[in-house]
């Protein structure tokens, strides 16, 4: 699709890559043709190929989830649901794991690659339940995965006693937090990400200085502050 857009003569492309390495040849082709490449939500492996990158502070998103978990539980066995071909996922997992490792009472007992998709997260969670894996915490790199995990746990009568954390601040996840089913989510601000990306494109068009990389802040949503957020949309 990127090659097609470039061949059609577009002058700029906003990209949220599913695989931050496999995207490189298409990006290199675009740069050869003079196309501005703006990355949103997640990064490219070689950041020098991007004209601009606008992302959430993904490492801090993982840190916030881990810190909140540590404030709520004295110990735990953790399953991580990740998407290792995206930089955003890797940063979230790294932030979470780095923070958890500071406490010797928590153990990561499994890491599942669910490609960031609910329909993959749910059967993976079911497989772990069937295997009898001992865990009481699940950290998912996005709320879609967390929702798949919770659906599987509900089907197996295991929702009680399992702490589920995610990243996004999606409306469905906020509803689950309000109902005390989900523990917490690190909220992203997609409107702010999009606005920053468009602003930088205008800077490119008008010859003004462009910020090479912008990190948008994230905030934890939990039972303590859920009433400050709407469950009917994004923040």
Residue positions per predicted region:
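Hydrophobic alpha-helical segments within soluble ligand-binding/sensing domains
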Residues: 54-78, 90-91, 118-125, 170-173, ...
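Hydrophobic alpha-helical
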Residues: 2-7, 12-31, 96, 110, ...
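Secondary-structure junction motif
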Residues: 81-82, 86-94
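Short beta-strand elements in bilobed, periplasmic/extracellular small-molecule ligand-binding domains
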Residues: 77-82, 97-119
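Short secondary-structure boundary segments
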Residues: 17-18, 42, 82, 142, ...
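Flexible loop/hinge segments that line or gate small-molecule binding clefts
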Residues: 20-60, 77, 86, 168-183, ...
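Loop/turn elements at helix/coil->beta-strand transitions in domains of secreted/extracellular proteins
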Residues: 8-12, 32-37, 50, 74-77, ...
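Hinge/cleft segment of the Venus flytrap/periplasmic-binding protein
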Residues: 99-100, 189-235
